[in-house]
Amino acid sequence: MSENQQALNHVVSMEDLTVDQVMKLIKRGIEFKNGAQLPYEDHPIVSNLFFEDSTRTHKSFEVAEIKLGLERLDFDVKTSSVNKGETLYDTILTLSALGVDVCVIRHPEVDYYRELIASPTITTSIINGGDGSGQHPSQSLLDLMTIYEEFGHFEGLKVAIAGDLDHSRVAKSNMQILKRLGSELFFAGPEEWRSQEFADYGQFVTIDEIIDQVDVMMFLRVQHERHDSGAVFSKEDYHAQHGLTQERYDRLKETAILMHPAPINRDVEIADHLVEAPKSRIVQQMTNGVFVRMAILESVLASRNAN
């Protein structure tokens, strides 16, 4: 048994995880990446419920479940009783009653999971696949795994997060845990898209002020679907003011890495030809998503077996 195996009742927010739990998930993800096997003979059942569009999170959870040998119960929102007005609570209550062990959920409502994990009747474990502009723990963990593979530590690393900060659950998840891990944080992007909560975790800067100093340069997608009004910038203006141009890429330190949670608006956040540039770890992030999600699923199922 690996010393990095652990039992977690739910994984819903980076705020709820200790540094030790986070490090074990990262290291267990690396073990899975290196070929660790964990077949489940009792065939636990997992259901993925995505109420918002997703490619990477949804499909990497599916691949993780396949690799672990789990049984997957398909849930199609479009053909479910949600279209008859059934609440999320009653949907999960039903799946729990049917014997589903784990529900992976993405939902537009921030903190949707609080009601579910507080219920004495719902016994299924909850993994948050993203709640509105709130939290995205599995994305944060795969980002951390990618950074850890590169540098072997977090203490003292300079990390810049740039883009649509206010609407990004990735930014909020990462800023909370990276500060606890000892990284120095910087936030860049349009003033219209940043709130004072970020000031508690790092410094507001322009991208040009910081790009030649950072170890990690993380860009965020412009989330048009979460904006109340039309675009503040044209694509060209945004890219020129806040995106990764060739000139900015050339200013990165030799050892710096480029990250983005994807999907990417090419030639907006990052110039098209730089998405797969030598300093980019974007593809590695996607790959790591499978293995860290295997670690998350394992930890939640271990908790169920212990109870």
Swiss-Prot record:
Catalyzes the condensation of carbamoyl phosphate and aspartate to form carbamoyl aspartate and inorganic phosphate, the committed step in the de novo pyrimidine nucleotide biosynthesis pathway. One of its GO terms (biological process) is 'de novo' pyrimidine nucleobase biosynthetic process. One of its GO terms (molecular function) is amino acid binding. Belongs to the aspartate/ornithine carbamoyltransferase superfamily. ATCase family. InterPro entries: Asp/Orn_carbamoyltranf_P-bd (IPR006132), Asp/Orn_carbamoylTrfase (IPR006130), Asp/Orn_carbamoylTrfase_sf (IPR036901), Asp_carbamoyltransf (IPR002082), Asp_carbamoyltransf_Asp/Orn-bd (IPR006131). It catalyses: carbamoyl phosphate + L-aspartate = N-carbamoyl-L-aspartate + phosphate + H(+). L-aspartate binds at residues 84, 169, 221. SUPFAM superfamilies: Aspartate/ornithine carbamoyltransferase. It holds the Pfam family OTCace. The keyword Membrane does not apply. Keywords: Pyrimidine biosynthesis, Transferase. Heterododecamer (2C3:3R2) of six catalytic PyrB chains organized as two trimers (C3), and six regulatory PyrI chains organized as three dimers (R2). It is an enzyme of class 2 (transferase). Carbamoyl phosphate binds at residues 56-57, 106, 136, 139, 262-263. Its EC number is 2.1.3.2. One of its GO terms (cellular component) is cytosol. It comes from Streptococcus pneumoniae (strain Hungary19A-6). This is Aspartate carbamoyltransferase catalytic subunit. Transmembrane segments: none annotated.
